Each structure stands twice: as C-alpha cells, then as structure tokens.
Amino acid sequence: MKNNNEIVEIYTDGACSGNPGPGGWAAVLIYKGIKKEISGFEENTTNNRMELKAAIEGLKALKRPCKVNLYSDSSYLINAFNEGWIEKWQKNNWLKSDKTPVENQDLWKELLEVSKPHQINWIKVKGHSDNEYNNLCDRLATEQIKKHIKENP
C-alpha cells in the first residue's frame, strides 16, 4: 500500500447449527470501495471456532501488510485482543487464570501468526443490528450451513 493511511475494513462472523454442530464462517473485505466476500464451512465445530476462522481467513486474504479495521460481533474474539487476554494466555503457556487450557489454541495461534504483518484495530459491533456488513457476514455464514445440510441430509 503506497499510502499508509489507507485502511482495509474486514467484517467477520461465524455461525453454528448446534454447538457443536455444522458451522459456517464469512468475511467481507472492503478496500477503496471494492468489496470481496469469502465464506466456508466446517462439519463439526463451535460458534467460537467459526468466529476465529472468519477472522483468520479474512486476514489471510490480504496480499500485503495492511492497516486493518476488523469488525466482529464476537466478544470472545475482540476481547482477547483489546482486554489483553491473549498476551496473558501466551505468558501462562496457554493456560487461563483458573489453570485450565485455553480452548481453540490451534486457531488462536494461527490468528496470531496471520495478524503479524498487519496493524489491526479490533472493533466490536453489535450482532443482528443494523450493521450492513455484519448482517451480510451472518447471512453468508448461515448460507454455508444451509447449503451443506441440504447437500448432505
């Protein structure tokens, strides 16, 4: 990016039918007015894993280091970065304060890795409200679940 003030906006969401159950994730990337939608499916997963997967895949879609505003309705995802949970988990060898292992370590570690090249603002949005792109992500993630359930009854 030539102009360091240019920001990529990434909206993410995950959905799960049952928890655990079949799940979908989606991300919408917006840069200079151009919108890219990506989404995917996992057979047996949880809503939190899908929220993390959406952020991972959104960041993996970037072709070079960027300034990013990443929007999610997942407190689990946003608070891990904004409240310093992730640093504490790393310092404590991926154990929570109650000494139990952090869930979804594989995805947290992958998310940290794909985050490294970027400057990211982690922004919480209200789910199922009037945020156009959060609602679009929710729809795309849910469509992934419906599509796979229909194809594999």
From Swiss-Prot:
Keywords: Cytoplasm, Endonuclease, Hydrolase, Magnesium, Metal-binding, Nuclease. It catalyses: Endonucleolytic cleavage to 5'-phosphomonoester. The keyword Membrane does not apply. Its main location: cytoplasm. Coiled coil: none annotated. Its cofactor is Mg(2+). One of its GO terms (cellular component) is cytoplasm. Monomer. Belongs to the RNase H family. This is Ribonuclease H. It comes from Caldanaerobacter subterraneus subsp. tengcongensis (strain DSM 15242 / JCM 11007 / NBRC 100824 / MB4).
